[in-house]
């Protein structure tokens, strides 16, 4: 029997990247309220857990102590003249009060999800405030200060577990790839908008790992305007075969929904139902699953997608019409059709062909270069 855990804290409402920043903490409370309205926070086989802030020593397993001290200093309001050298300052990674505590909370939630799965207290755990996959050992990057995904995988590896990481965010999961680039015990797979069109500028097929880890970093770059049909053709051709061949003990999935067709920062063209299809395809690929959030800058997409993902983790079929209790939130944020699913739209033939041809070339390269290294 599947037992599940969801990790959530309303403490997130105390943190704020700034009024003009696209990453809005409001999305977390909005998601939680939609889950509540659907009855998903009181399921009989699911337990709600509150995260504790990660200790400095846990964060230092991946991040340098020098960088951690800089984070603590700027968070406390100290003047750090070289903060920009650590990726901190106006723009993507602003300095705000409580920055360090927010980073600790995010890391703590993902570490808790990993522990619950490793200890057998849950077969599937979801920390939707996590998935901040860009942070590097010594610098912030892409709205991410501490890489909770890396820390969660490290905790699972401490237990001797073999881990596959699949990242379906629109942005390449560069920080996670970097952390395990030479490690054959961690398979990282990222599907994302091509790096020459979108931050962070990486994630090409030729980034395959190195040394003992050669073939264990897999990237599926996609053309802007890639829709559900093109995405799933590429996804099916690459992800299930490689994950199945790898035989992970635990699957860690990063569920960024900035791949959505109305996301303001990216250029892919998935729907909520296309996203959910990918989640449902991933869940059976390993006996245990740790799910994390990620990108997503249209708040109604975030709430609907992560609610649908949590329902899938619990094998619950949801009504397509959004619960009445959620209508005020959704209408306030501009959602026109009060449905869990998006209206069906057909890509123009030239756009579909352009995306399809590019995706098929990437898949062909992966099958030629990486599949043989896994006996495929």
Enumerate the predicted regions with their spans.
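N-terminal low-complexity, Ser/Thr- and acidic-residue-enriched intrinsically disordered segments
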Residues: 1-61
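Low-complexity, intrinsically disordered regions enriched in charged/polar residues
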Residues: 25, 53, 61, 65, ...
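Cationic, histidine-enriched alpha-helical/coil surfaces that engage anionic ligands
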Residues: 47-87
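Short amphipathic alpha-helical segments with coiled-coil-like heptad repeat character
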Residues: 39-41, 67, 119
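A general "terminal functional-core" signal
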Residues: 1-8, 13-16, 70-376
């Amino acid at each position: 029997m599947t037992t599940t855990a969801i990790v959530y804290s309303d403490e997130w409402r105390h943190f704020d990247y700034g009024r003009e920043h696209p990453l809005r903490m409001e999305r977390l409370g909005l998601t939680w309220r939609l889950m509540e309205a659907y009855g998903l926070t009181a399921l009989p086989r699911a337990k709600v857990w509150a995260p504790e802030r990660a200790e400095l020593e846990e964060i230092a397993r991946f991040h340098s102590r020098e960088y951690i001290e800089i984070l603590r200093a700027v968070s406390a309001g100290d003047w750090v003249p070289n903060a920009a050298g650590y990726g901190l300052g106006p723009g993507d990674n602003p300095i705000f009060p409580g920055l360090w505590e927010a980073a600790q909370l995010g890391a703590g939630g993902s570490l808790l999800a990993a522990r619950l799965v490793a200890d057998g207290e849950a077969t599937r755990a979801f920390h939707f405030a996590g998935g901040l996959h860009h942070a590097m050992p010594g610098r912030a990057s892409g709205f991410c200060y501490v890489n909770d995904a890396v820390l969660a995988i490290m905790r699972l590896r401490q237990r001797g577990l073999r881990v596959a990481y699949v990242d379906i965010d629109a942005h390449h999961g560069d920080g996670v790839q970097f952390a395990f680039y030479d490690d054959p015990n961690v398979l990282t797979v990222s599907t994302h908008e091509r790096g020459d069109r979108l931050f962070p500028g990486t994630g090409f097929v030729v980034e395959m790992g190195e040394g003992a880890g050669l073939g264990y970093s897999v990237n599926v770059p996609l053309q802007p305007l890639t829709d559900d049909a093109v995405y799933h053709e590429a996804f099916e051709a690459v992800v299930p075969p490689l994950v199945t061949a790898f035989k992970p003990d635990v699957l860690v999935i990063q569920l960024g929904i900035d791949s959505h067709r109305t996301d303001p920062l990216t250029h892919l063209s998935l729907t909520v139902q296309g996203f959910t299809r990918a989640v449902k395809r991933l869940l059976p690929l390993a006996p245990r699953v740790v799910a994390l959030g990620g990108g997503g800058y249209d708040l109604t997409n975030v709430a609907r997608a992560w609610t649908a993902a949590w329902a899938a983790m619990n094998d619950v079929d949801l009504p397509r019409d959004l619960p009445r209790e959620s209508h005020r939130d959704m209408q306030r944020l501009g959602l026109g059709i009060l449905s869990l699913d998006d209206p069906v739209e057909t890509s123009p033939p030239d756009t579909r062909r352009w995306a399809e041809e590019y995706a098929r070339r990437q898949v062909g390269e992966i099958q030629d270069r990486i599949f043989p290294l896994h006996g495929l």
